From Swiss-Prot:
Its EC number is 3.4.23.36. It catalyses: Release of signal peptides from bacterial membrane prolipoproteins. Hydrolyzes -Xaa-Yaa-Zaa-|-(S,diacylglyceryl)Cys-, in which Xaa is hydrophobic (preferably Leu), and Yaa (Ala or Ser) and Zaa (Gly or Ala) have small, neutral side chains. It comes from the Bacteria. It is found in: Cell membrane. The chain crosses the membrane at residues 55-75, 87-107, 125-145. This is Lipoprotein signal peptidase. GO terms for molecular function: aspartic-type endopeptidase activity. Pathway: Protein modification; lipoprotein biosynthesis (signal peptide cleavage). HAMAP family: LspA. The active site is at D111, D129. It comes from Symbiobacterium thermophilum (strain DSM 24528 / JCM 14929 / IAM 14863 / T). GO terms for biological process: proteolysis.
Length: 152
């Protein structure tokens, strides 16, 4: 249940933040939040993370759907009971669904978080991307700290 609740919260926060950006900012506009470091910049992304594999709409929808189906199946297994694992899978699932909604509805994802330092700009991303990244990091942590000790 923890994974499902966390996934739902992630999807809601992701979709609300994207809606706020899309309805209050012009495409490609930027609002500097921390000068020289962080801005909100509204862009569309038809690819994956960092703009890779542009125009792969249905490929990414299929990958996200398969990932969600796999996670839902795994969550029914006894070995998925560890809380850290459930949090990790909930975040990954929520992020996958958040971006999948955009891809199905519009064929692109709204990205708006932009970090930069001098001439280096990290690619724009969104809340769903954060959820997937943190979820995968927690999954790795679970594998290293829990699975290796055999305490899952």
């Amino acid at each position: 249940m923890l994974s499902i609740v966390l996934a739902i919260v992630a999807v809601v926060v992701d979709q609300v933040t994207k809606w706020l950006v899309a309805t209050r900012m012009a495409l490609h506009s930027e609002i500097e939040i921390i000068p020289g470091f962080f801005s909100l910049q509204y862009v569309h992304n038809t690819g994956a993370a960092f703009g890779m594999l542009r125009n792969g709409r249905w490929f990414f929808v299929a990958v996200a759907a398969l990932a969600v189906a796999g996670i839902l199946y795994y969550l029914r297994q006894p070995e998925s009971r560890h809380p850290l694992l459930r949090v990790a899978l909930g975040l990954v699932m929520g992020g996958a669904v958040g971006n999948m909604i955009d891809r199905i509805a519009t064929g692109r994802v709204v990205d708006f978080l932009l970090f930069y330092w001098r001439d280096y700009y990290f690619p724009n991303f969104n809340v769903a991307d954060i959820c997937v990244t943190v979820g995968v990091g927690l999954l790795f942590l679970h594998l290293v700290l829990v699975e290796r000790k055999g305490t899952a």
